[in-house]
Amino acid sequence: MTAKRPAPETCDYAAVAHALRTHAEDYRREVHEQLFAQILPARDLFPMSAASAHQELVPALAWYFEQCAANAPVAHTEQHLADLAREHRRHGFPPQVYTTFVECLVSGLDTLELKPADATAAAARLHHLARVMADAAEAADLAGTAPAHRLHVVGVRRPNRQVGIVKLSAGLPTQFAPGQFFAVTTRHLPGTWRELYAAAPPTAAGELEFHIHATGPASQLLRAARVGDEWTVGSPRGEFAQGLHQHSSADGVYPVLLCFGTGWAPARAWLLGLVDAAVAAGQAPDIEASVYVVAPSPGHHYDVVVQENLAALNPDMRMYLLVDSAMDPQLLGAEPPVVEMDFEVSADPVSLMLERETTRGNRFILCGPSQRVAQAQAQLLAAGVDAVDIEAHPFDRAGLWELN
């Protein structure tokens, strides 16, 4: 049964959201401490440091209260919360834990210095949020949906000293949509999960491919994977190229993809999925789209063979490989190029893209590190592109709530 949203209260929900963002660290620390005190298994599942845990907590709650302030459609808001609950089943907690979890959330409100009326109304909304998430988690349990899967590494390639391409296999089909991402961890990362976009569409053998850029200790460990390693992978999440799962010229949409670094991964999965669908239907692939892949230098472009093949297969696809510099860093250690590709040097890829796509592009899809995606989104908005025509896919989970 779907939880009913509580009756409207006199509350400045926008002020609650603002207070959460302003006092994010204090709130997260308080909730973290309450979780450790009241839910003992949490000590084995989350990092001891509050700074390393629950990165998505405050942005998600702030987004929720902003939706309340805007009187957003209930179904839209609750769908996001339900997806979050289903994905968090990977931690192994039963749905009943939300009863305790919401008390931790409510206790943390004291750090926000809210008006009494706002605090009371916010607490009621948090209890509603917990019921929605508990119902979604319980429904997934009753449906027999696995909260996570164990996969084994079957292939590793390191095209340069910063990027690793890791292939895993479950041995059984893994259901997901091209462009979705997964939370992953290994025994070397106790309590730490990283979100990675699948770089290829699903296969009958349950294979997954991830492109990992080593930016910190966790991603460096994942990039250093060896064949035979076991990874734990959560449920797929997100939606890429919304409404374009069977994109063709007939749908009247011309997508323009802007990928920064390994932000190419979800775009790659989506494009290959369209090719697979066309072949399965006995048709020649013909994807109308412009694709801009941005990297610091030519050696950072690690997937040029697939990019060239996609461009060759699809006459109406325009593939642009952009670089900040024409020269590779001395210690990049990039593989020798297998094919010759033209790289364009551009200090401002968004402006270059806009110059070329003024008459064609009407859906801009941004993928990559959160800062680059946020900057690109701001440039597009400043140039007059409507917000509804921009789809952002930032790498970190907090960014998912900030940009969408």
Language-model features, listed with the residues they occupy:
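Phosphate- and divalent-cation-binding pockets in alpha/beta enzyme and binding domains
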Residues: 221, 266-269, 375-376
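Reductase modules of NAD(P)H-dependent flavoproteins
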Residues: 19, 290-404
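Phosphate-binding glycine-rich loops and their immediate beta-loop-alpha structural context
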Residues: 257-278
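Ferredoxin-reductase
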Residues: 146-234, 255, 295-296, 323-326
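Short, conserved phosphate/pyrophosphate- and ester-handling motifs at nucleotide-, phospho-/glycolipid
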Residues: 179, 263, 369
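Core of compact, soluble alpha-helical bundle domains
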Residues: 1-149
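A short, basic/flexible loop-to-alpha-helix module at the beginning of a structural domain
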Residues: 236-250
